[in-house]
Amino acid sequence: MTINEIQDNVIEEFSAFDDWMDKYSLLIDLGNSLPALDERYKTESNLIEGCQSRVWLQADYVDGKIIFQGESDAVIVKGIVSLIIIVLSGHTPQEILDADLYFIEKIGLKEHLSPTRSNGLVAMVKQMHLYAVAFRAKEM
């Protein structure tokens, strides 16, 4: 699936709920379904700066695609991590760099987050882009 197809699926899944409490429950469920990050990846270098909660993001380059893993110590943030990983993991560096992450706006995520969580979301996406830039440079 393309990044846009995945985003469209996410939008459809979130649009099934009118109430943001239900959407938060969906985020929590997504976070609970995120595989635990191996302790060896919970390092300072994998810690995302700009997040109020502790968020770790690990990226591996496998067969030309970036595989992301992540975790957070906060349940809603862990759901956000899971959501971003669902959309971007398993794609090439160029696909990630070219992606317009419109689902964030369409599901209303950014406007329903506190300013610090919103900043954390931006920091997570920025870090994923930095990984994509680094892995793309290795391709050349």
Mark where each language-model region is.
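N-terminal intrinsically disordered, cationic/polar leader segments
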Residues: 3-11, 16-54, 61-62, 104-140
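Alpha-helical support elements that line or immediately flank enzyme active sites
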Residues: 81-91
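Mobile acidic interaction elements
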Residues: 7-15, 60-72, 79, 98
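Short, hydrophobic/aromatic-rich beta-strand segments within well-structured domains
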Residues: 56-58, 83
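Residue-level signal for short amphipathic helical patches enriched in basic/charged
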Residues: 75, 91, 116
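Glycine-rich phosphate/pyrophosphate-binding loops
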Residues: 90-107
